[in-house]
Amino acid sequence: MYEKVFKRIFDFILALVLLVLFSPVILITALLLKITQGSVIFTQNRPGLDEKIFKIYKFKTMSDERDEKGELLSDELRLKAFGKIVRSLSLDELLQLFNVLKGDMSFVGPRPLLVEYLPLYNKEQKLRHKVRPGITGWAQVNGRNAISWQKKFELDVYYVKNISFLLDLKIMFLTALKVLKRSGVSKEGHVTTEKFNGKN
């Protein structure tokens, strides 16, 4: 009952409340990103519930700087000072409140990954798409980018099989603690984690 009905109601109400409460933060962050790097919003297609494709929203924290060959510079070079602050405080995820409001996402669930990963999942890993993807999830509070893809997917599937209101509350509480401690954002020495290749 919780997964099918109350979780969506809870998501909608909480997203609405948080959008109102955080609207000043969202506006100030957008303004400062506009001033410091020009572009504000990053959008990308991601697979959601039952692998249905939706457009995810994030604050854009990296510039589009390229080398003399026209290739994008490394993530480390494109992530500027204010972008680092936005990421360290997880402010880049705030725009996903709109995804939750629309019903594309939930507050808690497996993170929505790249569309190109879909054919790489095995049968068990595909179960992560049996629920709405989340802003945070069981994998994010148990290692995030510091653990292997295989371990992340194991944690995602555990969540799908054990979803409950109490588990969601626990994950949100642990997420808040991690944001305050600014922990688990990326592996040491990397801005983003390596891509999934079906074996890692």
From Swiss-Prot:
This is Undecaprenyl phosphate N,N'-diacetylbacillosamine 1-phosphate transferase. It is found in: Membrane. GO terms for cellular component: membrane. The gene is pglC. It catalyses: tri-trans,hepta-cis-undecaprenyl phosphate + UDP-N,N'-diacetylbacillosamine = N,N'-diacetyl-alpha-D-bacillosaminyl-tri-trans,hepta-cis-undecaprenyl diphosphate + UMP. Pathway: Protein modification; protein glycosylation. Its EC number is 2.7.8.36. N-linked protein glycosylation in C.jejuni consists in the transfer of a heptasaccharide (GalNAc-alpha1,4-GalNAc-alpha1,4-(Glcbeta1,3)-GalNAc-alpha1,4-GalNAc-alpha1,4-GalNAc-alpha1,3-bacillosamine) from a membrane-anchored undecaprenylpyrophosphate (Und-PP)-linked donor to the Asn side chain of proteins at the Asn-X-Ser/Thr motif. It is a single-pass membrane protein. GO terms for biological process: protein N-linked glycosylation via asparagine.
